[in-house]
């Protein structure tokens, strides 16, 4: 069996329920890629003896043994090489269980906002998973829940290993930074079907690849032995544990239940930014101070005139903080 082919997918379930689902998907051959290229489906039991102990590939068993969730991450799709994990879960949303995750060792066309495309090498944790929501008003906020779960997962794994915490920060709306350099990002897309929003969440996190910026282990390698460095599988398992807890709080109590922790983790409290406001035919620039988030997920800021404003990106800049447009509340 050639599991190194670019269109090979390996299915692995946490329990007999997910294992039966994997077998059914393989037998029915229903998983497809957006370009309709041929897909080879394998079960984890078929390939486990072909993976070497020193293999740098994602360790499926290590991840699955770390999972203690009830819904998320219990059904795994893994591939050594994919164009996009996000495309796999979004294109097959109706075929796979809600909460399924797709992981790839190498990703050539990872999806970013405004159709940006990212190439991700080995050592980067690249995954996409699915969830369902009914209230469209809070769907835009799910990216903040995901961002927070990633930072808290890294913190938990560091604590368990006795390591000093890598201080990963959130740059609004969906980037992750370490020591001033971008090490990750989140993308959420959704479609509406049968009165539900079908949300596909994509995450990329530099764990063990120092290019193109830096990574989590680059900060740790000088202070701990290689055997104690962070592993992608451990971080992903910790992420789903955190996310499931945060998601339940979010759905029951709203984002207010997570705001305090989120604001301790993001980079922007008290940040002064330039916002633009159209005044008849002129564009006026004003300096405002970021206070937090509005109920719709945009930036809440206060002007020097003590008036509260909601800040929106203009959509024309790669940096969200260039070209902010303000709207009086």
From Swiss-Prot:
tRNA-binding is among the record's keywords: no
GO CC terms in record: cytoplasm
Gene Ontology BP annotations: protein modification process
Broadest EC class assigned to this enzyme: ligase
Tissue/organ expression: Highly expressed in seeds. Expressed in roots, leaves, stems, flowers and siliques.
Segments forming domain BPL/LPL catalytic: 67-251
Molecular functions per Gene Ontology: biotin--[biotin carboxyl-carrier protein] ligase activity
Enzyme Commission number(s): 6.3.4.-
Main subcellular localisation: cytoplasm
UniProt-listed InterPro entries: aa-tRNA-synth_II/BPL/LPL, Biotin_CoA_COase_ligase, BPL_C, BPL_LPL_catalytic
Loss of function: phenotype: No visible phenotype under normal growth conditions.
Residues reported in the UniProt entry to bind biotin: 84-85, 107, 111-113, 182
Intracellular or extracellular location(s): Cytoplasm
UniProt KW keywords: Cytoplasm, Ligase
Top-level taxon of origin: Eukaryota
Family: Belongs to the biotin--protein ligase family.
PANTHER family (UniProt xref): BIOTIN PROTEIN LIGASE, BIOTIN--PROTEIN LIGASE
Function: Seems to have no or limited implication in biotin-dependent carboxylase biotinylation in planta.
Protein name: Biotin--protein ligase 2
Species assigned in the record: Arabidopsis thaliana
Top-level taxonomy: Eukaryota, Viridiplantae, Streptophyta, Embryophyta, Tracheophyta
